[in-house]
Amino acid sequence: MTSEVIEDEKQFYLKAKTYWKEVPPTVDGMLGGYGHISSIDISSSRKFLQRFLREGPNKTGTSCALDCGAGIGRITKRLLLPLFGVVDMVDVTEDFLIKARTYLGEEGKRVRNYFCCGLQDFSPEPNSYDVIWIQWVIGHLTDQHLAEFLRRCKQGLRPNGIIVIKDNMAQEGVILDDVDSSVCRDLDVVHRIVRSAGLSLLAEERQENLPDEIYHVYSLALR
């Protein structure tokens, strides 16, 4: 439980916001110095996502996606824009969203909205998104705020839409990172929060070929 490791919720959010303001708006900055893993990450994400986009009666649409904790648009550029007609981005750091406009290049014209907002305060437009992608950002929300955000995301899905969480998972319990003011939860804790938000797990996969010294990374598809 985040309530056991976060002493002051207001400070938890403020400290994270301050931390990201000092991070350079680059791929390396977004990935905490692990920019070299970006291609491995995107390639696996594409395979994971495409199983839901294939032909079939319940296939997920490709009209519109939402990139949560989007930063400068690394995932929007490499994963979402090639697969979806329109993408919206949301991030708490305004400088990242400003940088995104040049980083995304010509294809960036298909980014419809740049929302500058913390996810704890963000509500996706109901019935708007085929895919809501939430990567390396759930650790910046308390358990309660994460459950509430996922409930709002559920409302934001179009028919056959999915939510994807891709994030670090701890071996056991909840670990606080005091540097960037985030938490890392184990899979059981994340599963519990997902269930409390009224979502079902459709698929789960561990990311392969990452450096040994970093946390295990899992993708979860939810509806």
UniProtKB/Swiss-Prot annotation:
Pfam families per UniProt: Methyltransf_PK
Catalytic reactions on record: N-terminal L-alanyl-L-prolyl-L-lysyl-[protein] + 3 S-adenosyl-L-methionine = N-terminal N,N,N-trimethyl-L-alanyl-L-prolyl-L-lysyl-[protein] + 3 S-adenosyl-L-homocysteine + 3 H(+); N-terminal L-seryl-L-prolyl-L-lysyl-[protein] + 3 S-adenosyl-L-methionine = N-terminal N,N,N-trimethyl-L-seryl-L-prolyl-L-lysyl-[protein] + 3 S-adenosyl-L-homocysteine + 3 H(+); N-terminal L-prolyl-L-prolyl-L-lysyl-[protein] + 2 S-adenosyl-L-methionine = N-terminal N,N-dimethyl-L-prolyl-L-prolyl-L-lysyl-[protein] + 2 S-adenosyl-L-homocysteine + 2 H(+)
Subcellular location: Nucleus
In-chain residues carrying the UniProt-annotated modification N-acetylthreonine: 2
A single BP term in Gene Ontology: spindle organization
UniProt-recorded Gene Ontology molecular function terms: histone methyltransferase activity; N-terminal protein N-methyltransferase activity; protein methyltransferase activity
Modified residues (N-acetylmethionine): 1
UniProt keyword annotations, A-Z: Acetylation, Methyltransferase, Nucleus, S-adenosyl-L-methionine, Transferase
Residue numbers binding S-adenosyl-L-methionine: 69, 74, 91-93, 119-120, 135
EC number(s) stated in the UniProt entry for this protein: 2.1.1.244
A Gene Ontology cellular-component term: cytosol
Entry superkingdom: Eukaryota
Free-text function comment from the UniProt entry: Distributive alpha-N-methyltransferase that methylates the N-terminus of target proteins containing the N-terminal motif [Ala/Gly/Pro/Ser]-Pro-Lys when the initiator Met is cleaved. Specifically catalyzes mono-, di- or tri-methylation of the exposed alpha-amino group of the Ala, Gly or Ser residue in the [Ala/Gly/Ser]-Pro-Lys motif and mono- or di-methylation of Pro in the Pro-Pro-Lys motif. Some of the substrates may be primed by NTMT2-mediated monomethylation. Catalyzes the trimethylation of the N-terminal Gly in CENPA (after removal of Met-1).
Family membership noted in the UniProt record: Belongs to the methyltransferase superfamily. NTM1 family.
Protein name according to UniProt: N-terminal Xaa-Pro-Lys N-methyltransferase 1
Gene: NTMT1
